[in-house]
Every structure is written in C-alpha cells, then in structure tokens.
Amino acid sequence: MKLILTADVDNLGAPGDTVEVKDGYGRNYLLPRGLAIVATRGAEKQVEGIRRAQEARAVRGLDHAKELKAAIEGLESVTLTVKTAGGSGKLFGSVTVADVAAAIKAAGGPIVDKRSIVLPKAHIKNTGKHAVVVNLHPDVVAKFNLNVVGA
C-alpha cells in the first residue's frame, strides 16, 4: 500500500514522505490514527506544493533571523537594573530569560521570544556583564553582553 505520511513516524519517515507499507499496517494503524493518507496523484501534487511553500517559508525565516541578529548585535548596551541584597553584588532574586527579553526590547531592540534566549547559567544571580546567546534560527545565533546593574 502506498501512503503519504502526515506526521513523523518512527522507523518509517517524516511528514510528506511517500512510503510503501504492508496493507494491514496502513489500514489498521497509520490511516485510522491520521498518520498517513492514501497516495493519489492529487495528494502527491498537494504534498509537493506544501513542500515548496515550506522551503520558501524557511528561506524567509532565515532572512528574518539574519535581520534580527543584526538588530540585536547592533545594540550599544543592554542594561538591566535589579535590586541587590547588600553591597556584595548579589541580586535579590535572579534575572530570568523573560527579564532579558524585556531588557532587549527596552534597549530599542526587536521583540525576542524568551524561549530562544540562552543564559550562561539557568539564572543570573549577580551584577556585572554576562554573555547572552539568542537562538534565532538553527543557522543564526546572536550574541550580546547583558550588563546587570544593582538598584
């Protein structure tokens, strides 16, 4: 039985792949669970159109990620003011990725998804300069220094 996968199936393929499987596996497992559709000429043309659209979207996503990288790395200084506990430079609490995303926006940078920000440790717990990485795309990574200042 010839099928087109609509979801990632272990040991079989990725969405959009045309696979040849035994009739029982296709009829009793893949089709009822919505993991595949029967391969017809119309379905193959539709999958090809979707694949071309995804490739075009990926190229646009890469261009957009490069623009965001230039904007983030072009920021002169990203400063975050936080309460400190005493004069030792330790913070009262910690700086999270959401705080860093807000600091980038406040510094005049683009809006960045907090899930794409990678801190040197899980949380920043002291004042000073910290290297922060932003994963914008699998091929594009922006790096900048975050200056944490006590209030």
UniProtKB/Swiss-Prot annotation:
Coiled-coil region: none
InterPro entries named in the record: Ribosomal_bL9, Ribosomal_bL9/RNase_H1_N, Ribosomal_bL9_bac/chp, Ribosomal_bL9_C, Ribosomal_bL9_C_sf, Ribosomal_bL9_N, Ribosomal_bL9_N_sf
GO cellular component term of the entry, any: ribonucleoprotein complex
Keywords: Ribonucleoprotein, Ribosomal protein, RNA-binding, rRNA-binding
GO BP field: translation
Family annotation (Pfam families): Ribosomal_L9_C, Ribosomal_L9_N
GO molecular function: rRNA binding; structural constituent of ribosome
Protein role: Binds to the 23S rRNA.
Family: Belongs to the bacterial ribosomal protein bL9 family.
Protein name as annotated: Large ribosomal subunit protein bL9
